[in-house]
C-alpha cells in the first residue's frame, strides 16, 4: 500500500527550476525525446477503433489507451506495471503518458524550418548572407547553389539556374559541388566557421562609414554571437528529424454515426508521412532526378504547412475549405495556448447568476442563493456529514445532499460560516472587479449585492450577472478575508479617494434630510440633545427641514491624535441633527451641518477614514446607506411632467435670436459677409441663446417663493423634485434638464459639422418630425461609439498591463536623491491642481526650506500625508522635489520610497505590491469613459477667441519667471523671450495663477508689484508677431529695394503707407539672393551691437513682414520695427480622448511636430534650397554650428541674430516626446507626458494619480542606446536594458576601464512589451512567432522575474503573498539546501506578509 502511495505521490511532482531556456533542438535531441518512429500515416482501425501499429496513434510508441492495460488485453491491472507485452509490444502504464510521450519521423531529405526562414528578419538568410528570394529558389528546387567551388571560377554561395549548371558541368566536370534543396542550405550552414566570421565582422565594422552597412553588419554579428553563445549550431535550423506531438494533444474522437472528429494536426502529419514514405521509395528505386526533386519539394511544403500553415504560399485547406490549424496557430492569438489556457483558465467551484439589490446587507456580506451554495460547497458538506456520522460513506452523503434533507441545510449553514466567497463581474477592469464577501443564505435564485460596492464593480441591476468563486485552501481563505474583503477596499487604487460612496437614492435621501426650509413646523425651537430632536420628530411636532438650535456633545480628534470633548449649541435643522446620530465619534458636527450633496458625502467618508480609521468608516458607510434609503423613501421625490418648468423668457430669447439671424442672412445676401462668417456668427448667436434659456430655466427651477414666519414673501431654494436630483448629484445634470425644459440646441450633421438651425423645442413641448430626424444621428452615433470604445479601451489596458506587469516593489529604499520638481499645475491661469494635492502620498527627495531662509521645514525622506500637505500650503511653498518611479534606481522592480503611498491603503506601499499592474488598471479602467472621436476645431466649438492680454483673477504680487525683457521709454516692459511666464502670488507667497507671455508682449507691471483682481497686466497683438529692438538708435534699411524685395501698400481706409517684404518666389530674378534687413546705427552712422554681444544689431526681415518705421527714423528700446502677420492658426484636428492617450503611450511621433533647437546659440539663416530654409545655430560655447533644413511653409518663431536655448521651440506644432527626451531630459519628458495624459482624463472628470502614469513611463524608458562602447562588449547603436548597462559600467569602473556611454530611449508600450527580457511574457503578448524564433536562435533564458511568466508556468506570482514564497526559495537556493518549501513555511511567511500589510 505504501508503495502505491509513493507511486501516486511521484505522479504529481514537478521539478523545481529557476529559469527556462529555449533553443534549437538538435536531431540527436529530437531522437532522445522520441519513444519510436512513426512509419505509417494510419491513425486508428475504423472497425476495432484500436490504434494501428507504427501509425500516428500507435500504442507501442505512445503508451496504452486504457490505464494499466495493454492493447491486446494480455496484461491488465496495476500489478503488471512496467511490463512490456510480448504480443502487442505495449508497455503497461497510465493512459496519461499518451499526453507526454513523443515520437519522430526520420526525413528522407532535410527540410528547412519555415520559422527561421520566413520570420523576418530571416535568420538563415542573415547567417548565409543571401537574400530570402535566393534561398527560397534553392529550397524549392528552382536553382542550384555552389557549395564548394573547388579550383573553378565559380564562387561559394553563387546561384546557378539549370542552363548555367549544365554549362559549368561541361566546362569544369566534377571539380565543383553545386546542389539544390535543403541539403545544400544545410551544407552551407554547416560550413560556417562562427569564430572566424565573428572576428572578421568585428574588424570590418569600425572600418565602414556607411550607416546602412554598419547596421547590416552589426545585425549579422549579433546573430553570430548569439549562435556562438547559446550552443546552437546553424545547421539545426534545417530539420533532418521531425518530432511528433503526443497523440492526446491532437486527439481523434469518434462521433456517433461512425464519423470522426480529428485535430487538423493529424491531417498535416499524415501528409508529411505520406510524402516522406513516397520519397524513400523513389530513392530506393533510384528514380529520375526530376521526380525525386518534385517529391522533395512537396515534402518541404508539407513540413512548412505542419509548422506554420499559410506562412508561405497558399494555406493547405481541409475538406471544408478552411485552412488547417498548424502548430504555430495552436500557440498564437487569443485562442492560442498562451492566452486561452495558460494565462487564464476556467475554474471549478464557481457559478454565476443575475444580481439584485441587497439593501439590508452589511458591507462585508452578499446574498447567496441556497441552491448555488449547496452545489459550490458540496465537498465541504460531504466531509461534514461524514464527520458528524450522519452519513457512513461519501456515496451516502451524496444521496443525502441530492435529496436535500433538513440535516443538509444545517450542515451547509455551518460550512458557510466565515468562509468568504469571491464575487467577480466581467469585465474585470481593475482589481476591485473581484472582491470577497461573507455569504448569507437566501431564498430565490439571484445573488444579492450590497449597493455600495456597485461603483467598484460598475454594476447595476438591469440584468447584470456575476460569478461566484470559492477559495478552497486555508491560505486562499486567509487572503480573501485579509486582503480582498470588500471592507478592506474602501479607497480606490487609482486616486486614493473613497470608492465606497453612496449614489443615487442614498444621496437623494441624505440631501433631502439635510436641506433647510423657511417656516417649517417647529422652526426656532431649542433642544437639549439629539434624543429629544428624535422624539419630537417622530411625534410629528417638528418637520425634517425646520431650522432649530440643538445642544450637542462632540468628540474631535486633534492632529496629534488626542481626543477633545466639547459641548455647544449649534444652529442646524432637524434632519442634520438626526444624521449626526450615525456619525462616528471623532468627527465634528460641522461635517453634517450643510446640505449633503454627493461631493460632500465623498469628502465626509474620506475624512472619516483618515481620522477614525477603517472599521468605523465601514460601519458609518453602512449606516449612511440605511439612513439615505429610509429618508429618500419618506421624501416621496418623484418626477411629473409639471416639474419641468419652462421659463417665460424662452419665447423672447428665441424671438430675438431669430431676428438677429435674419439680419445676418440679409447681410450675406447683399454680399457684406462671406458664407463662413455668416455660419460662425449664426452658430455663435444660437449658442448664446441656448445658454440664456438654460440660465433662465435654472434660475426658475432653483428658487421658489414662500411665506416666512412674519408673513412676508421670501425666496428659498426650490424643492422641485428634478432640481433636487440634479443639485444633490443623485441623477441628471443641468445639461440634461436643459433638454427637458429649456431647448435642445444645436445638433451636428453626420460629417461632424453643426447644423445652423437649432432645435428650439424641448422634450416637454415635443419635437417636430424634422427636429426628431435631426436628433437621430447623434443618438445612433453614441451607440456606435460605445461599442468601438469598449474594444479600444480594453486593448489599451492589455498593452499597459503587459508593459508594466513585472514592476513590483522589491525594496524599501534605493537611496537615490533624484526626483521630479513638483509645482502647482496651472492651466489658462487657473490652478487646476494645487501643489499639496500633487505631492500628497509622495516622499520628499531633498530637504524643503522655508522660503527665503535656510531652515529645513520638511526633511528629505518624509512621506507627505494630509497633515504635511496643510503644513506645506501654510508655508506657501511653491515647489518641492519629490521621489518618483521614473528616477528609482532599483534593479528589478521599484523601491517603496520612490513610489510613496499605497493609494488604496493610505500608508507607505508594502514590499511585494504589484504597482505596475495597478498603474495599468488605473489608467485603463476609465478608458471606456473617454471619447473616441477627434475634434475638428472650428465653428461654435472654437469660440474662445485668441488671447490678447492677461487679466488676473486674484489680487497679489507679480512674479516673472525666466523672462528676458527690455524697458520702453514709457516705463512698460516688453518681453523678448519666448518661454516667459507671469505669475500672481497671494499674501502667503503661494502662486495662485500663472500665464505664458508671448514674445513682444507689453507688460505694465514690475516684478514684486501688487495688483488688484481683474487688472490687465500685459497686452499683445494676437494676429502678428513683432520684431522688437533691444536698443535705441537710428534705423537704416539694408537691401530694401522697391518692387524687387519690398512693395509699398497704402491702406484705403486710413491712408497710411506700409512696406511689405516680398516672398522669395514673388521677387524678380535680381532680388532672389538679396536679404532685406533693418540695421541700427548711432548718430554718427556707426553699427550698434546687440547688448552684451559682438553681433551687429541687424534684424533680417522674413517674407511678408510689414515694416512700420521709416528709413532714418529714431526709435527707442522695446519699439516694434516690423510685424510678421500670423496666419490665424489653421483649424488643426485635436485628437482627443482615448486615441490621444494611446498615441502618448505608444510614443508616436506626431505629424508636423514642433521643431526644437538642438543646441543653445545664435540663430542665422544659410543658403536656401528649393523648398526649404537652412537654419544655422552657432553655439555659444564655440563648438561646431548646427544646421537643419526646414520646409518653407513652416512658420518660424525665431529670427536672425536671436539667442535660443537648447530645447526651445523654433516652429510651433504638437510636441514630439522623443525630442523632449533628447533635448530636455527625462524630467521634462515626464512633466510633458503626465500633463498631456492628465488633461484628457481631467476633461472627463476622471481623477488618476500622477504616480501611475510615471510608473508606466518608467517601463517605457527601460532601454538605452549605446553611443560609445568603451571597454564593454556592447556595440555602438545597440539597444540595451538600462540596468544591464549600469551593472556593466559599475564592473568596468571597478576595474579602471573605460565605461560605455549611452542615451535614454523612449519606447512605445507595445514595443517595450515585446523587448522585455522575458520571452514567455513577450510571446504571450503579440507576434508570438517572431518572439519565439528570436528567443530560440539566441538561446534565451527566462529567469521568470515577472508576473506573467510565473502564471504561464503555473507558479505563485512574485508579488503580494507570493513574494514570500519566492524570496524563501531564493534564500534556500543561496544557502544551497535541498529545495523543498513545506506548506508550514509558506504559511508562516504568508502570515508575516499579511501582518505587515495590516499595519
From Swiss-Prot:
Its cofactor is Mg(2+); Zn(2+). Pfam families: RNA_pol_Rpb1_1 (PF04997), RNA_pol_Rpb1_2 (PF00623), RNA_pol_Rpb1_3 (PF04983), RNA_pol_Rpb1_4 (PF05000), RNA_pol_Rpb1_5 (PF04998). Mg(2+) binds at residues 460, 462, 464. It comes from the Bacteria. Keywords: DNA-directed RNA polymerase, Magnesium, Metal-binding, Nucleotidyltransferase, Transcription, Transferase, Zinc. One of its GO terms (molecular function) is DNA binding. The keyword Isomerase does not apply. Binds 1 Mg(2+) ion per subunit. Binds 2 Zn(2+) ions per subunit. One of its GO terms (biological process) is DNA-templated transcription. InterPro entries: DNA-dir_RpoC_beta_prime (IPR045867), DNA-dir_RpoC_beta_prime_bact (IPR012754), RNA_pol_asu (IPR000722), RNA_pol_N (IPR006592), RNA_pol_Rpb1_1 (IPR007080), RNA_pol_Rpb1_3 (IPR007066), RNA_pol_Rpb1_3_sf (IPR042102), RNA_pol_Rpb1_4 (IPR007083). It catalyses: RNA(n) + a ribonucleoside 5'-triphosphate = RNA(n+1) + diphosphate. GO terms for cellular component: DNA-directed RNA polymerase complex. The keyword Transferase applies. Its EC number is 2.7.7.6. Zn(2+) 1 binds at residues 70, 72, 85, 88. Zn(2+) 2 binds at residues 814, 888, 895, 898. The RNAP catalytic core consists of 2 alpha, 1 beta, 1 beta' and 1 omega subunit. When a sigma factor is associated with the core the holoenzyme is formed, which can initiate transcription. PANTHER family: DNA-DIRECTED RNA POLYMERASE, DNA-DIRECTED RNA POLYMERASE SUBUNIT BETA. Belongs to the RNA polymerase beta' chain family. DNA-dependent RNA polymerase catalyzes the transcription of DNA into RNA using the four ribonucleoside triphosphates as substrates. This is DNA-directed RNA polymerase subunit beta'. It comes from Pseudomonas putida (strain ATCC 47054 / DSM 6125 / CFBP 8728 / NCIMB 11950 / KT2440).
Amino acid at each position: 500500500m505504501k508503495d502505491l502511495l509513493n507511486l501516486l505521490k511521484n505522479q504529481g511532482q514537478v521539478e523545481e527550476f529557476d529559469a527556462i531556456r529555449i533553443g534549437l533542438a538538435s536531431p540527436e535531441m529530437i531522437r532522445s525525446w522520441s519513444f519510436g518512429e512513426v512509419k505509417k500515416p494510419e491513425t486508428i482501425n475504423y472497425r476495432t477503433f484500436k490504434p494501428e501499429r507504427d501509425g500516428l496513434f500507435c500504442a507501442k510508441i505512445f503508451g496504452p489507451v486504457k490505464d494499466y492495460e495493454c492493447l491486446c488485453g494480455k496484461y491488465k491491472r496495476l500489478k503488471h506495471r512496467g511490463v512490456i507485452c510480448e504480443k502487442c509490444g505495449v508497455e503497461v502504464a497510465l493512459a496519461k503518458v499518451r499526453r507526454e510521450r513523443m515520437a519522430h519521423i526520420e526525413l528522407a531529405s532535410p527540410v528547412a524550418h519555415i520559422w527561421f526562414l520566413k520570420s523576418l528578419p530571416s535568420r538563415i538568410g542573415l547567417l548565409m548572407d543571401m537574400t530570402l528570394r535566393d534561398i527560397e529558389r534553392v529550397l524549392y528546387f528552382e536553382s542550384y547553389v555552389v557549395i564548394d567551388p573547388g579550383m573553378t571560377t565559380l564562387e561559394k554561395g553563387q546561384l546557378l539556374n539549370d542552363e548555367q549548371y549544365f554549362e559549368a558541368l561541361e566546362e569544369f566536370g566534377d571539380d565543383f559541388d553545386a546542389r539544390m534543396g535543403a541539403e545544400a542550405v544545410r551544407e552551407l550552414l554547416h560550413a560556417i566557421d562562427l569564430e572566424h566570421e565573428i572576428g572578421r565582422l568585428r574588424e570590418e565594422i569600425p572600418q565602414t562609414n556607411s550607416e546602412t552597412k554598419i547596421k547590416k553588419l552589426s545585425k549579422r554579428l549579433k546573430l553570430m554571437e548569439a549562435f556562438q553563445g547559446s550552443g546552437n549550431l546553424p545547421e539545426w535550423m534545417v530539420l533532418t528529424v521531425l518530432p511528433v506531438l503526443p497523440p492526446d494533444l491532437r486527439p481523434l474522437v469518434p462521433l456517433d454515426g461512425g464519423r470522426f472528429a480529428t485535430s487538423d494536426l493529424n491531417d498535416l502529419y499524415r501528409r508529411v508521412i505520406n510524402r516522406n514514405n513516397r520519397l524513400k521509395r523513389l530513392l530506393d528505386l533510384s528514380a529520375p532526378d526530376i521526380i525525386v526533386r518534385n517529391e522533395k519539394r512537396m515534402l518541404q511544403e508539407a513540413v512548412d504547412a505542419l509548422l506554420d500553415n499559410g506562412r508561405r504560399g497558399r494555406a493547405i485547406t481541409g475538406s471544408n475549405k478552411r485552412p488547417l490549424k498548424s502548430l504555430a496557430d495552436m500557440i498564437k492569438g487569443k485562442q492560442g495556448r498562451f492566452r486561452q489556457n495558460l494565462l487564464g483558465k476556467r475554474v471549478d467551484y464557481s457559478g454565476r447568476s443575475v444580481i439584485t439589490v441587497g439593501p439590508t446587507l452589511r458591507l462585508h456580506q452578499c446574498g447567496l442563493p441556497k441552491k448555488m451554495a449547496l452545489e459550490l460547497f458540496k465537498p465541504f458538506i460531504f466531509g461534514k456529514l461524514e464527520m458528524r456520522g450522519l452519513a457512513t460513506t461519501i456515496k451516502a452523503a451524496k444521496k443525502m445532499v441530492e435529496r436535500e434533507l433538513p440535516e443538509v441545510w444545517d450542515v451547509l449553514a455551518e460550512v458557510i460560516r466565515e468562509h468568504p466567497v469571491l464575487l467577480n463581474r466581467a469585465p474585470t477592469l481593475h482589481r476591485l472587479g473581484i472582491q470577497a464577501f461573507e455569504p448569507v443564505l437566501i431564498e430565490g435564485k439571484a445573488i444579492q449585492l450590497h449597493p455600495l460596492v456597485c461603483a467598484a464593480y460598475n454594476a447595476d441591476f438591469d440584468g447584470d450577472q456575476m460569478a461566484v468563486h470559492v477559495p478552497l485552501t486555508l491560505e486562499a481563505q486567509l487572503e480573501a478575508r485579509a486582503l480582498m474583503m470588500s471592507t478592506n477596499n474602501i479607497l480606490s487604487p487609482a486616486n486614493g479617494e473613497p470608492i465606497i460612496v453612496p449614489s443615487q437614492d442614498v444621496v437623494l435621501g441624505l440631501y433631502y434630510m439635510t436641506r433647510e426650509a423657511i417656516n417649517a413646523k417647529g422652526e426656532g425651537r431649542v433642544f437639549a440633545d439629539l434624543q429629544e430632536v428624535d422624539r419630537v420628530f417622530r411625534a410629528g411636532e417638528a418637520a425634517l427641514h425646520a431650522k432649530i438650535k440643538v445642544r450637542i456633545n462632540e468628540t474631535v480628534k486633534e492632529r496629534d491624535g488626542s481626543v477633545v470633548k466639547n459641548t455647544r449649541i449649534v444652529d442646524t435643522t432637524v434632519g442634520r441633527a438626526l444624521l449626526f446620530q450615525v456619525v462616528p465619534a471623532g468627527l465634528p458636527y460641522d461635517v453634517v451641518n450643510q446640505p449633503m450633496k454627493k461631493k460632500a458625502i465623498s469628502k465626509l467618508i474620506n475624512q472619516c477614514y483618515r481620522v477614525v480609521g477603517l472599521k468605523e468608516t465601514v460601519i458609518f458607510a453602512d449606516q449612511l446607506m440605511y439612513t439615505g434609503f429610509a429618508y429618500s423613501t419618506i421624501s416621496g421625490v418623484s418626477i411629473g411632467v409639471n416639474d419641468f418648468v419652462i421659463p417665460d423668457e424662452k419665447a423672447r430669447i428665441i424671438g430675438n435670436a431669430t431676428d438677429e439671424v435674419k439680419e445676418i442672412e440679409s447681410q450675406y445676401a447683399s454680399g457684406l459677409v462671406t458664407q463662413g462668417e455668416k455660419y460662425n456668427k449664426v452658430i455663435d448667436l444660437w449658442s448664446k441663446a441656448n445658454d440664456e434659456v438654460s440660465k433662465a430655466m435654472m434660475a426658475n427651477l432653483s428658487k421658489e417663493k414662500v411665506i416666512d414666519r412674519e408673513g412676508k414673501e421670501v425666496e428659498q431654494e426650490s424643492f422641485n423634485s428634478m432640481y433636487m436630483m440634479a443639485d444633490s448629484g443623485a441623477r441628471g445634470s443641468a445639461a440634461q434638464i436643459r433638454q427637458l425644459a429649456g431647448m435642445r440646441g444645436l445638433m451636428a450633421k453626420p460629417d461632424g459639422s453643426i447644423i445652423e438651425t437649432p432645435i428650439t423645442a424641448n422634450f416637454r413641448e415635443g419635437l417636430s418630425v424634422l427636429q426628431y430626424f435631426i436628433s437621430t444621428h447623434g443618438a445612433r452615433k453614441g451607440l456606435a461609439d460605445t461599442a468601438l470604445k469598449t474594444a479600444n479601451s480594453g486593448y489599451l489596458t492589455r498593452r499597459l498591463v503587459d508593459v508594466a506587469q513585472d514592476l513590483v516593489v522589491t525594496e524599501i529604499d534605493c537611496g537615490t536623491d533624484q526626483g521630479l520638481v513638483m509645482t502647482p499645475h496651472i492651466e489658462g491661469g487657473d490652478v487646476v491642481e494645487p501643489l499639496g494635492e500633487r505631492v500628497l502620498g509622495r516622499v520628499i527627495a531633498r530637504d524643503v526650506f522655508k522660503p527665503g531662509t535656510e531652515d529645513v521645514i520638511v526633511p528629505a525622506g518624509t512621506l507627505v500625508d494630509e497633515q504635511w500637505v496643510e503644513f506645506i500650503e501654510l508655508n506657501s511653498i511653491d515647489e518641492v522635489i519629490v521621489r518618483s518611479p521614473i528616477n528609482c534606481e532599483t534593479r528589478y522592480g521599484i523601491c517603496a520610497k520612490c513610489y510613496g503611498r499605497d493609494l488604496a491603503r493610505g500608508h507607505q506601499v508594502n514590499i511585494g505590491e504589484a504597482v505596475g499592474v495597478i498603474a495599468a488598471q488605473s489608467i485603463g479602467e476609465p478608458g471606456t469613459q473617454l471619447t473616441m472621436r477627434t475634434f475638428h476645431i472650428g465653428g461654435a466649438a472654437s469660440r474662445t477667441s485668441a488671447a490678447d492680454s492677461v487679466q488676473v483673477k486674484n489680487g497679489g504680487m507679480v512674479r516673472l519667471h525666466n523672462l528676458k525683457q527690455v524697458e520702453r521709454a514709457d516705463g512698460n516692459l516688453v518681453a523678448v523671450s519666448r518661454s516667459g511666464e507671469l505669475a500672481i502670488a497671494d499674501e502667503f507667497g503661494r502662486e495662485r495663477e500663472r500665464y505664458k507671455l508671448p514674445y513682444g508682449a507689453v507688460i505694465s507691471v514690475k516684478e514684486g508689484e501688487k495688483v488688484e483682481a481683474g487688472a490687465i497686466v500685459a497686452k499683445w497683438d494676437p494676429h502678428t508677431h513683432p520684431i522688437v529692438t533691444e536698443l535705441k538708435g537710428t534705423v537704416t534699411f539694408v537691401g530694401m529695394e522697391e518692387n524687387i524685395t519690398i512693395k509699398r501698400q497704402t491702406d484705403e481706409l486710413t491712408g497710411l503707407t506700409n512696406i511689405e517684404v516680398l516672398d522669395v518666389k514673388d521677387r524678380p530674378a535680381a532680388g532672389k539672393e538679396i536679404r532685406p534687413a533693418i540695421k541700427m546705427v548711432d548718430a554718427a552712422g556707426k553699427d550698434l551691437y546687440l547688448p552684451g554681444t559682438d553681433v551687429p544689431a541687424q534684424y533680417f526681415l522674413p517674407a511678408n513682414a510689414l515694416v512700420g518705421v521709416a528709413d532714418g527714423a529714431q526709435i527707442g528700446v522695446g519699439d516694434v520695427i516690423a510685424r510678421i502677420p500670423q496666419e490665424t492658426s489653421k483649424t488643426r484636428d485635436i485628437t482627443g480622448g482615448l486615441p490621444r492617450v494611446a498615441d502618448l503611450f505608444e510614443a508616436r511621433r506626431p505629424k508636423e511636430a514642433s521643431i526644437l533647437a538642438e543646441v543653445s546659440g545664435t540663430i542665422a539663416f544659410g543658403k536656401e534650397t528649393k523648398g526649404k530654409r537652412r537654419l544655422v545655430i552657432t553655439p555659444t560655447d564655440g563648438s561646431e554650428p548646427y544646421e537643419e533644413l526646414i520646409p518653407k511653409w513652416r512658420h518660424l518663431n525665431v529670427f536672425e541674430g536671436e539667442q535660443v536655448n537648447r530645447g526651445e521651440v523654433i516652429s510651433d506644432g504638437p510636441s514630439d516626446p522623443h525630442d523632449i527626451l533628447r533635448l530636455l531630459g527625462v524630467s521634462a519628458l515626464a512633466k510633458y507626458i503626465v500633463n498631456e495624459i492628465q488633461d484628457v482624463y481631467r476633461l472627463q472628470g476622471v481623477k488618476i494619480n500622477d504616480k501611475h502614469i510615471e510608473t508606466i513611463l518608467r517601463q517605457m524608458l527601460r532601454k538605452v542606446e549605446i553611443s560609445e562602447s568603451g571597454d564593454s562588449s556592447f556595440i555602438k547603436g545597440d539597444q540595451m536594458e538600462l540596468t544591464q548597462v549600469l551593472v556593466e559600467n559599475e564592473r568596468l569602473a571597478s576595474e579602471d576601464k573605460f565605461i560605455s556611454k549611452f542615451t535614454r530611449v523612449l519606447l512605445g508600450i507595445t514595443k517595450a512589451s515585446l523587448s522585455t527580457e522575458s520571452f514567455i511574457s513577450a510571446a504571450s503578448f503579440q507576434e508570438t512567432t517572431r518572439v519565439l524564433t528570436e528567443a530560440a536562435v539566441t538561446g534565451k533564458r527566462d529567469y521568470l522575474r515577472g508576473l506573467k511568466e510565473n502564471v504561464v508556468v503555473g507558479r505563485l506570482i512574485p508579488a503580494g503573498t507570493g513574494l514570500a514564497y519566492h524570496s524563501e526559495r531564493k534564500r534556500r537556493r543561496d544557502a544551497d539546501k535541498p529545495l523543498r518549501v513545506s506548506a508550514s513555511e509558506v504559511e508562516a511567511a504568508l502570515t508575516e506578509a499579511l501582518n505587515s500589510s495590516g499595519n
